[in-house]
């Protein structure tokens, strides 16, 4: 059974080509805006624990600000290894609310 929780207001979402951190139930998520499409993933890089939501977007990937690992926001896969990945989550906008499926 899916559980949708409010993660942000629409006005708080990152601009195109940006990522931002949001917290729901004491867990921090990375929300990225790539070409107008929003994606949500775990905020912690599997390499050294860097905050992905503080990174940049490059070639459609979220780049960890600590050591440059790049993640596909649709699959959570890291470029360095197909086995290195973060969890991804569905998000949707309803009116002014942005919801994440936990």
Regions found by a protein language model. Name each.
Residues 1-59, 72, 77, 85-102:
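N-terminal pre-ligand scaffold of iron-sulfur
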Residues 45, 64-67:
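Short cysteine clusters
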Residues 81:
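Short glycine/proline-centered loop/turn elements that form peptide/ligand docking sites
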